[in-house]
Structure formats: structure tokens, C-alpha cells
Amino acid sequence: MAKIMVAMSGGVDSSLTAVLLKEQGHDVTGVTMHLWEGDDNGIMESQCCSVEMTAGARRVCAQYDIPYYVFNYQKDFRKHVIDYFLREYSSGATPNPCLACNRDLKFRVLLERAELLGFDGLATGHFVQITGGGEQPYDLRRGIDINKDQSYVLYMLSQRELGRLHFPLGGFTKPQVRQMARERGLVTADKPESMDICFIPDNNYRRFLNEERPEIMQPGPIVNRHGTVLGQHKGLPQYTIGQRKGLGIAAGSPLFVIEIDTVRNLLIVGDADELERRDFVIDDVRSVYGQIEAGIYAVQIRAHGEAVPATITPREDGTLHIRYDQPQRSVTPGQAAVLYRDDRVFGGGRISTERYS
């Protein structure tokens, strides 16, 4: 049996992960990453870093005689997640902080610490599956619960990392997970889901940006493709590609955000057809198998979106050109584009602010 560190948020998924591994005979230790202290707005009870949620993890570990520790990673979180979040908004992109946290903290910093402490591997409660191994490469696959599948936010995992990771919940649905937790009497069995932006407790990221980077929240013109001024925006980070509501302009037909120009501080709007794109570029490319070959893949550009066929062409600078068979709406710079074949993840990258032509 293996010695496994389990990253525990205090929710039902990571709690059951620890218990299942313990029941399988593994030597399990629970660990919570203390990432964010919060501010005057406090921490919501459903947040993964809240006192209440951490207490849940501690109680589950006590119930099953699992050693439990809290590691302080606030400085790393500031560097790798908060600063990234602010940097992306400053460049006109829409960040995904969960991706940054997985890439730079959970599956790099924490995994490295687990190895230094003598653990054989790290486990989390993500709904994904790992197959293969031995003489075959490891495969990262979607979880069987399509509504909870989290492979989109784990596309950056390498062969080395997959060989040290455990995802016991990938073969279960969320209702099954909750039921198994209830059967075991876990106090976290009916805990609500944690919020996406864990470091913004009131979910008001505009307030957060105003406090952290007021200089990027300057108002400016809203224009169409022809440069006609239609109104004034309240700061570019308050908008995202495809947004329709909250623009504060009147027009004869619906208008959507189609481009964010940080150089000229312009919010560019247009009709629905102008949202469609067939071609775009992804940078910071990661591959499960070492490199991504040219070819046809199903490409997913939103966490719970559909993976749609596209042709992938590697470029000399290490980026990938993606060309969809059919135009897609709201291709959003800063978000991830993840490449699949069937349920298998091949890799992905960040949708670039570069306009491909």
C-alpha cells in the first residue's frame, strides 16, 4: 500500500477521497492549503479556506484516525494566483484562477512538498480518471459524471505528475459521492459547493480589482468596429467577451462585447455574428504526452462547454493555431482551450489575446 497525501478543502469530495484511500489500506495524511486570509468582507462559509470548512476536514480526519495538517501557502498563492489574476485583467484577458492554482500550487508546489516529506503520491477530489501506466503512458480522462467532469482544469498535468497522482472519485457521480459520504457519517456529506473565486468572498471581483489595481479600472469609450462612440465603459476589467448585459447603451439590436482593447482603453461591441471566430491561437501550451501533434481534436473553450472539432497546427514559436470546423461564439482570451479525443485529454493552453489572421 502507498503513503498518500490528500489535499483537503473541507468539502465532501476531498473528505471522501481521504476516507476511500484509508479504507483501501493506504497510509493517508490529510493536508489543507491555507491560501488566503480574506479581508473586511470576511470569508463565506462555503469557501475552501474558511475556518468552518477547514474544521470539517479536521473532523473527518479525526473520525477515521487520519493525521491532518494545515500548510501555509499564502505567499505562493499571492504570487501564482492573485498576481496572475490581476495581470490577466490588465492585459484585457479573462483569467481562470482555478487553472493557475492547479498548475502552480496543487500539482507543483504541494506535490513537490509531498515528495520531500516521503509520500508516494498526492490525491485530490477532482472528478477525473487516470488510466494506463506500466509500459504504457498514463492517460488523463474525463470523469464519468459529465456534469462534474474537471479534466478541463487539469489539462496541464504531465506524465511525471500523473504517475504520482490519485483521483478516486473519477468513476463516480456526484450523487453517489454524497451518498457514500452519508453512509460513512461524514460531517461534510451535505456541504455546499465552494465558490469558483475563493479569494473574493462576496464574488464581487470588480470591487477586488478596484482595491488592488485601481489604475486599470479607468472609464473610456464604447465603440463599434467603425469607431463610432456609443457610450462609456466603467473600466475594461468589468467586461468579458460575449457580454451583453450591463453595457449601458441603447441600440436597435442587441450588442455584445467583441473585443477589449487595453492599449486604447476601448470596449468594442458588435452584433452576434461578430462574436463568431473560427481561428485563434493558444500560448503557454502544455501536453499530457510531451508534445501536441498536428491533427484534428475536439477543442473545449469553457469549463462546462462542448468540445467541438478543430484542426490544430503547431507554430514555430511554440503556440498552436486552432481552426474550428464551424465558427464558435465567445472565444475568450485568458481562458483555456483543451484538446480531447473521445474522453482523453491531450493538453491545451491559454487562449491568446493575439488576433489570428
From Swiss-Prot:
Chief location: cytoplasm
S-S bonds: 101-198
Keywords: ATP-binding, Cytoplasm, Disulfide bond, Nucleotide-binding, RNA-binding, Transferase, tRNA processing, tRNA-binding
Binding site for ATP: 7-14, 33, 125
InterPro entries: MnmA-like (IPR004506), MnmA-like_C (IPR046885), MnmA-like_central (IPR046884), MnmA-like_central_sf (IPR023382), Rossmann-like_a/b/a_fold (IPR014729)
Keyword tRNA-binding part of the UniProt annotation: yes
Region entry Interaction with tRNA, spans: 148-150
Cellular compartment(s): Cytoplasm
Chain positions of site Interaction with tRNA: 126, 335
E.C. no: 2.8.1.13
One biological process term in Gene Ontology: tRNA wobble position uridine thiolation
Superkingdom of this protein's organism: Bacteria
Pfam families: tRNA_Me_trans, tRNA_Me_trans_C, tRNA_Me_trans_M
Cellular component terms (Gene Ontology): cytoplasm
Active site: 101, 198
Annotated catalysed reactions: S-sulfanyl-L-cysteinyl-[protein] + uridine(34) in tRNA + AH2 + ATP = 2-thiouridine(34) in tRNA + L-cysteinyl-[protein] + A + AMP + diphosphate + H(+)
Sample GO molecular function, one term: tRNA-uridine 2-sulfurtransferase activity
Homology family: Belongs to the MnmA/TRMU family.
Record's function text: Catalyzes the 2-thiolation of uridine at the wobble position (U34) of tRNA, leading to the formation of s(2)U34.
HAMAP family according to UniProt: tRNA_thiouridyl_MnmA
Protein name in the entry: tRNA-specific 2-thiouridylase MnmA
Record lineage: Bacteria, Bacillati, Chloroflexota, Chloroflexia, Herpetosiphonales
